Amino acid sequence: MAAPAPVDWRVTLRQRVAIVAVTTAAWVGCIEARLVYLQLFKRADLLARAERQQMRTQTVPPKRGDILDRRGRILATSVDADSIYAVPTEIANAEGAVKQLCAALEDCTARERQNLIERLGQQKAFAYVRRQIAPDQAKRVAALNLDGIGFIKESKRFYPNKELAAHLLGYVGIDNTGLDGLEATYDSRIRGKAGTMLVQTDARRHVFSRFERPPTYGSTVELSIDEYLQHIAERELHNGVLVNRALGGTAIVMNPRTGEILAMANEPTFNPNTYREAEEAARRNRAVQDLYEPGSTFKVVTASAAIEEKVMNPDTLIDTNPGRLVIDRSRVITDDTGRNSGVLSFANVIIKSSNIGAVKIGFKVGTDRLSRFVSLYGFGLQVSPDFPAENGGIVWSPEKWTDSALASVSLG
């Protein structure tokens, strides 16, 4: 049997080199094809992804405009306050950093402490530690000189007169948004326009650049309120509530010629600087949200309807004898004095607040005309856009007015 021919090592080498060359060419071709695909078809997506990974944008709240009284005195303003932020990617030991931060802040709860450990342990470029802190807290935290911890100047709402005009002014949340009162009604005007802070990081998420576009200040709003009159109204209302052991009360001072509100006070009240500590009932603006019967003040509406419709004049005599008036066979109306007032002039009916006289005037005016004047005076309607929560009141439809209802409306 013949021996096998010897294998030429040169042929084997050439075959192996050819295999390696083909494999390498195919591998390089795949890489090039992938690169072409990424550059031609995925370029925009990759650029956007890289930008998202390297750049973080944080909103910087604007400074709200001031709220002034009619003489330019400040009722609400904004002051600078430090907010602590962290760059978690620059913090090697989150638990240790939180321990030092809470020691400096002095009032961390167990829940806040745990929440901070979790947030500072995440691989993020930005996280708030605490916002709008007190100056002494800011000094203590700054003295720690911790890596990855910095400060942002934010705007904090401040009410220098504390409880004064609290229900009118309302209050502002942590994000600089008006939550109640005029702060909420005129929020878009007072708030201003937010700025931005751009943070750039490298591949290891280390911050190498920060850029801030400053916010735009909000507009100043001037009210018809007079700070001095507001103070007097609140003081006297408070004393009246104490003396009468009342649950609450309202006092309003108006300019009768223009309808301007010069003061609006409510009891109980609250401090808008610390509104979270106040009960909801104390934050309610009773002057515009609660319902009240107008009482004898409504007699002027009845009287003005009679004069305008020329039903009576100020010299018309009205007989209130015998000191009682029966309506619908069962309802008896008397004057509050409990005595027979006799014959009164139209003017004296109003001066003495005679119930019987007012009812007789109302019956002369009639349901249709009196109901029209009730509407003309704005009863049952919201009278000001300044108070979105205003309760317009309850006014019966004239079709439902009985004689007893007409009597009730006439005397208030």
Model-flagged regions — what are they?
Residues 1-13:
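N-terminal Lys/Arg-rich, disordered targeting/topogenic segments
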Residues 4, 76, 201-212, 225, ...:
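Beta-lactam-recognizing serine transpeptidase/beta-lactamase-like catalytic domain environment
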Residues 11-45:
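Hydrophobic alpha-helical transmembrane signal-anchor segments
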Residues 15, 41, 90, 96-106, ...:
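Small/polar-residue-rich segments within soluble enzyme cores
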Residues 54, 59-63, 194, 245-248:
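Short, small/polar residue-rich loop motifs at catalytic or cofactor-binding pockets
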Residues 62, 78-83, 88, 98, ...:
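Short beta->alpha transition motifs characteristic of CBS
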Residues 126, 148, 204-249:
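Conserved, well-ordered alpha-helix/loop/beta-strand core segments that scaffold catalytic motifs
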